[in-house]
């Protein structure tokens, strides 16, 4: 016997996608997340397409996943989607050593991040 389905935490007009283990610091990822917050999904995709930030490719992939979730899983209209939330969380931090002069060593931190994108369908203004 299977477990009962969990209640959906989002409203019916929203869909989300999560990208984990992104190899970038949360501070740098938040710069790209700020660009797309509150924008139409199509405009946000265009911004990410021409962004010069390295992580914009992964953010675009996560946004496309959120749009696909909205379309296929929740039957939302793609043309009416807006990025309602895009927030960044800290992931793990890998610690490595770098050789320094005179037999010493220095620590190198390699941070990871998590990205959550929530898209919402807004009513088309007539």
Swiss-Prot record:
<keyword id="KW-0694">RNA-binding</keyword>
<comment type="function">
    <text>This protein binds specifically to 23S rRNA; its binding is stimulated by other ribosomal proteins, e.g. L4, L17, and L20. It is important during the early stages of 50S assembly. It makes multiple contacts with different domains of the 23S rRNA in the assembled 50S subunit and ribosome.</text>
</comment>
<dbReference type="InterPro" id="IPR001063">
    <property type="entry name" value="Ribosomal_uL22"/>
</dbReference>
<dbReference type="GO" id="GO:0019843">
    <property type="term" value="F:rRNA binding"/>
</dbReference>
<comment type="function">
    <text>The globular domain of the protein is located near the polypeptide exit tunnel on the outside of the subunit, while an extended beta-hairpin is found that lines the wall of the exit tunnel in the center of the 70S ribosome.</text>
</comment>
<dbReference type="GO" id="GO:0006412">
    <property type="term" value="P:translation"/>
</dbReference>
<keyword id="KW-0699">rRNA-binding</keyword>
<keyword id="KW-0687">Ribonucleoprotein</keyword>
<dbReference type="Pfam" id="PF00237">
    <property type="entry name" value="Ribosomal_L22"/>
</dbReference>
<comment type="similarity">
    <text>Belongs to the universal ribosomal protein uL22 family.</text>
</comment>
<protein>
    <recommendedName>
        <fullName>Large ribosomal subunit protein uL22</fullName>
    </recommendedName>
</protein>
<comment type="subunit">
    <text>Part of the 50S ribosomal subunit.</text>
</comment>
<dbReference type="GO" id="GO:0003735">
    <property type="term" value="F:structural constituent of ribosome"/>
</dbReference>
<dbReference type="GO" id="GO:0022625">
    <property type="term" value="C:cytosolic large ribosomal subunit"/>
</dbReference>
<dbReference type="InterPro" id="IPR047867">
    <property type="entry name" value="Ribosomal_uL22_bac/org-type"/>
</dbReference>
<dbReference type="InterPro" id="IPR005727">
    <property type="entry name" value="Ribosomal_uL22_bac/chlpt-type"/>
</dbReference>
<keyword id="KW-0689">Ribosomal protein</keyword>
<dbReference type="InterPro" id="IPR036394">
    <property type="entry name" value="Ribosomal_uL22_sf"/>
</dbReference>
